[in-house]
Amino acid sequence: MKKVTAMLFSMAVGLNAVSMAAKAKASEEQETDVLLIGGGIMSATLGTYLRELEPEWSMTMVERLEGVAQESSNGWNNAGTGHSALMELNYTPQNADGSISIEKAVAINEAFQISRQFWAHQVERGVLRTPRSFINTVPHMSFVWGEDNVNFLRARYAALQQSSLFRGMRYSEDHAQIKEWAPLVMEGRDPQQKVAATRTEIGTDVNYGEITRQLIASLQKKSNFSLQLSSEVRALKRNDDNTWTVTVADLKNGTAQNIRAKFVFIGAGGAALKLLQESGIPEAKDYAGFPVGGQFLVSENPDVVNHHLAKVYGKASVGAPPMSVPHIDTRVLDGKRVVLFGPFATFSTKFLKNGSLWDLMSSTTTSNVMPMMHVGLDNFDLVKYLVSQVMLSEEDRFEALKEYYPQAKKEDWRLWQAGQRVQIIKRDADKGGVLRLGTEVVSDQQGTIAALLGASPGASTAAPIMLNLLEKVFGDRVSSPQWQATLKAIVPSYGRKLNGDVAATERELQYTSEVLGLKYDKPQAADSTPKPQLKPQPVQKEVADIAL
């Protein structure tokens, strides 16, 4: 009897092994032209570009969570700002001679115009529907107090008038005028306090999660697109023919499959660094990451929400990094208006909100540990700021809110944990390691795999970032007449700058506003607000900001 039992057991094991081998073989035979790792706005945007450029290419998207747009792209996990430098003061640093540098602001604004054109084109194609579900006009304002800050904002306003991209901006130091623009900010404020504000009517609030869901829903209508949820990438291996075999685990049933892809895009947010390292490409050795989270105070009280229609950004305190810039924002989430204030930085070793506490440790290697240490030593202000933020009490956060909303009541607000952002640290020959501003596309020399690292300015520039990726990875195709024609249909201003061309700027803003249902009035001539004589400033090194 024991022999029979043993025989049956051996047969069962053998049959199971044969079955597993058959499944493995079947999975190895699954092929796709493009594998998109991550179900966020970056993968959705790249997939949408490629659907128009090469409609016959097969695409597979894998997402670890049970739905798309549940991490950083989720509307509640970011500030929903259409970053265009209309109000973000850290994009216009003050030079040592006191002058204002606008180069970064112009670049950020140019990038957002590409996003607007991309979204407008998708609305016209029927890919994106009901623009008000994902983008709404919300004026963008800068607000400061104190003589030095007022002088800075006045000079910033004057400097930005050199650009055609900022012609609609208005400036005021009048309490009554600013109260009309942002009642919550001014009511209860000391009437003798010296304040100033700028306001641009064409600012936007954007629900990047909704854009992501709609783009992916459109991709799913094609038979050569596959979406696999609850699917986690466990391994990436380059094949001899420069294709990639990617092992994907089904988190629901515990099985694994192999996907053979000609091109792999790692758009997994905070998880992108670890997957890039897993690929083994030499370019990955130059990078490390440092996670920073964010919290917001949220109010859904109609008395608060209906009294505020603007995104109001302030100025970082002296000695604080740009990421500390507070803002009080109108948001449109889940079909209703709310007001958010923050962000307050938090620290966790997770690279994703739904990540692992081991993320930071597991991404630390012999290649990047020294650059990380150098960055910590060279950016002590940042370290000090993060420590101070982690130590904030409920009362501390409320006092910070009252600087922007003097009559705020505690009972109207609750604390919300937003998403995680991973700041790029790159090895540097001179400094050992440096914090990299913005986002960075990292690819292999063969152009078979690419990853997006970084956090700022984030989702608002998904369209230009993915356009940059196309140029970097598919350079020969991008230069072809076919791709050139298609790209110019998607982004009418592709290949040229709007800055300095008033007619082109107004034409594109008018077009995108009409299609997206946004407010746009032709700008009037700028006022003659005098530029102050600013004091010379000490040279300040750049510090990475967080796009929350």
Swiss-Prot record:
Compositional bias of kind Low complexity: 530-541
Record's protein name: Probable malate:quinone oxidoreductase
Family: Belongs to the MQO family.
UniProt GO BP: tricarboxylic acid cycle
Pathway: Carbohydrate metabolism; tricarboxylic acid cycle; oxaloacetate from (S)-malate (quinone route): step 1/1
Record keywords, A-Z: FAD, Flavoprotein, Oxidoreductase, Tricarboxylic acid cycle
Lineage: Bacteria, Pseudomonadati, Pseudomonadota, Gammaproteobacteria, Enterobacterales
PANTHER family listed in its UniProt record: L-2-HYDROXYGLUTARATE DEHYDROGENASE, MITOCHONDRIAL
Catalytic activity, EC: 1.1.5.4
MF term (GO), any: L-malate dehydrogenase (quinone) activity
